[in-house]
């Protein structure tokens, strides 16, 4: 049963009649944005399961059927008996999982544009009581194994934070994806030096549909030890899943979640929307649609003389350089987008509910301002 005022459909628009119901018409004002998949509302499948989970009472702190079913569904999809945890957001997922892999005197090797370095306010260092992030270079947002090995072998004395983890962002902060052979090369390097592999998969579903591989093939079969899987950016209101493919690494992890304020008492309201995404296949449909819209946006941009995306469009974002007056003019028209992500330029992000009409309107406004 759907909530009143919510329309069904593959491109369900979350801007519903809430404002009228609560006496504030301004809440109906649509946002003109290609800023972030975090701006988007809840997709119908996640919302349906959330409402279903709200029928009656259920045990607290994850001891409910919804949480068990969602965890089991992850195990089926990833074809392994992994440990599954649910937390509220990606910063907590990354920070707590990295803390589980490290002691305070260890270090984590990540790309210089990785979210754990640029956008988590020191969360990984805080959760681990001081594990240091070592920054590696690499083209298009991806780790270069040569650079990773340089950081591993640069020093081995007692004064240097001992490398313990390689963190991979899939898809990357620049909208590119690691190919299977690139993942395997990093795993081979990690094995050589006895390091663990952490994957920040806030947009893992976008990479998955691009590569047309199985979830297992792109994670534990490629050597990933822990995956932080994003739901918030893919149609959920809140909630990420942490999958430990090496179950021993999850020892006492529930205590970390509780201590960090990440043990949801009504966990079914995180788990049920996840189940909705997974059981209906919406997690892949949503990601595929977002990717297709980004590809369409990149195509329209390339048709404008003098404009060229900065990186290959392999997931759901497009980066490009625009003159400052054009950026200001677009914002004056009400368009919202980011200019502080990655290596600069404008980031345009598509989501599960981005429409061609919105992209066409953006292109029309952009062409007018460039004229």
Which residue stretches match the model-derived regions?
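Conserved PLP-enzyme active-site core in the AAT-like
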Residues: 28-333, 339-354, 362-370
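Short, Lys/Arg-enriched N-terminal segments with co-localized hydrophobic residues
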Residues: 8-26
């Amino acid at each position: 049963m759907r909530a009143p005022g919510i329309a069904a459909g593959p491109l369900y628009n979350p801007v519903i009649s809430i404002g009228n119901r609560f006496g504030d018409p301004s809440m109906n004002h649509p946002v003109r944005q290609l800023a972030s998949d975090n701006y988007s509302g809840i997709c119908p499948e996640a919302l349906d399961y959330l409402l279903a989970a709200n029928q009656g009472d259920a045990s607290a702190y994850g001891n409910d059927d919804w949480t068990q079913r969602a965890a089991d569904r992850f195990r089926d999809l990833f074809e392994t008996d992994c440990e599954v945890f649910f937390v509220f957001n990606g910063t907590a997922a990354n920070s707590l999982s990295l803390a589980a892999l490290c002691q305070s005197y260890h270090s984590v090797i990540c790309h210089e544009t990785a979210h754990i370095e640029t956008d988590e306010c020191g969360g990984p260092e805080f959760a681990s009581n001081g594990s240091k992030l070592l920054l590696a270079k690499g083209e298009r947002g991806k780790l270069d194994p040569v650079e990773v090995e340089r950081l591993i072998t640069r020093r081995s004395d007692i004064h240097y934070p001992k490398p313990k983890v390689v963190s991979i962002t899939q898809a990357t902060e620049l909208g590119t994806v690691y190919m299977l052979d690139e993942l395997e090369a990093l795993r081979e390097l990690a094995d050589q030096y006895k390091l663990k592999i952490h994957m920040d998969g806030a947009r893992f579903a976008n990479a998955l549909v691009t590569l047309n591989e199985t979830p297992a093939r792109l994670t534990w079969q490629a050597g990933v030890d822990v995956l932080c899987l994003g739901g918030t950016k893919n149609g959920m209101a809140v909630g990420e899943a942490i999958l430990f493919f090496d179950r021993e690494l999850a020892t006492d992890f529930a205590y970390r979640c509780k201590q960090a304020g990440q043990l949801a008492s009504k966990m079914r309201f995180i788990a049920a929307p996840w189940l909705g995404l997974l059981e209906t296949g919406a997690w892949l449909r949503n990601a595929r649609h977002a990717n297709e819209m980004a590809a369409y946006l990149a195509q329209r941009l390339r048709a404008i003389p003098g404009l060229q995306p900065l990186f290959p469009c392999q997931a759901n974002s497009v980066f490009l350089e625009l003159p400052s007056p054009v950026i200001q003019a677009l914002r004056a028209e009400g368009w919202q987008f980011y200019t502080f992500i990655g290596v600069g330029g404008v980031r345009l992000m598509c989501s599960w509910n981005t429409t061609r009409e919105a992209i066409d309107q953006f292109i029309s406004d952009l062409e007018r301002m460039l004229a």
